[in-house]
């Protein structure tokens, strides 16, 4: 399924959905999920959001990468859909940007390979899929063998990038994310001989952008927000215009904002956790005080009863003494 918002410019941005997992991977969100569907106001381009069709065939699947079945390549179908929509809009393929995060970024790169001169922006994508933890669920649910020739060809991202020189691939990775660093950043370094550095570096049609953000709730999920999206799109346009120095400068400013934003989110969470903890402590103290007040109330009742008995006993003794006195 898709969500579409028409813009005023002859440009098209396509957002791809990623994993359906929520609450630390414990739950699956219902589908369809349209990533960044409300961001049409952040750009004058038309915006197309596409949910992963894998979820319709495999409802228990947490992440499908738009892979398809053993015989059908869903990414090729999606590329045909994007090209038809761009034709109707009068958008040239060089003005198509395929955009995704995590598994959506993986799909963006793959679909880009089917659309000549298009661009892909992928934030923390999975590039060496065979090493990714979700593989434990992918094969049992889909029945797709990851050693199958079609699967390997579809997910050979080295070839996709190297064989499509007219396309622009901007891969953005969080150096603070262990899983992205250990698997995908090392993959890029090994396959492309990239001398990775903090900030932006370009190798032919591939540009690598390293940022560092602590992450909320985790570094892998330290994705962009509307402000960063606008900066990323501006960096992409500078890259396409061969103004790499300008792109690198803007990326460095974006990195500062990116790091500060998630640092503030982390502090906010810590403050909230402390507030919750303090709230719990205060509640516990209030409960203790309430229990003490109950005990004191019971003691006061006992004291009142004892005083009453003492008074009654004293009056009785006085009455007996008076009777004896008057009887004499």
Regions inferred by a protein language model and the residue ranges of each:
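Short, surface-exposed "cap/lid" segments of acyl-processing enzymes
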Residues: 1-45, 49, 53-57
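Alpha/beta-hydrolase active-site loop
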Residues: 65-88
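Alpha/beta-hydrolase fold nucleophile elbow
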Residues: 91-102
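Active-site nucleophile loop of the alpha/beta-hydrolase fold
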Residues: 122-131
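Boundary detector for helix-to-coil junctions that initiate low-complexity/charged tails
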Residues: 262-328
